[in-house]
């Protein structure tokens, strides 16, 4: 694909369908974005958004920190998605400005956008969860994993290597 683009100056890209995830409410204390995305993947399956875009929207989306939003978008691939996106809001624009990247344009979904599917998740009902071996959609409540001895743990990677994650792990 890369060589073809260099030679012809063109590229072929299939624009993915969008799947809308309307988020309501607010995550309870001690519940994190990874609990939310694992809950979503547990419901829709590891292939639930194959070659699609996961669009996170709604009043609940606005309550999530930028770090939480990054975690959801990063893990969208675990549901087979090509991308995960949030609608640009004041919090996102302010984050960009604070990091020297004022947006040149802000885009929003069309009011009459057509989605392949739509889901609603009440953030206040999300509970801590874990994905058991061997699949990311093998999601169970965290209390079902209590009592399992852990010899090693890794906090890092693109999924949970932000300073917020390290602080929680240190507690």
Named regions from a protein language model:
Residues 1-171:
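Fe-S-dependent hydro-lyases/dehydratases of central metabolism
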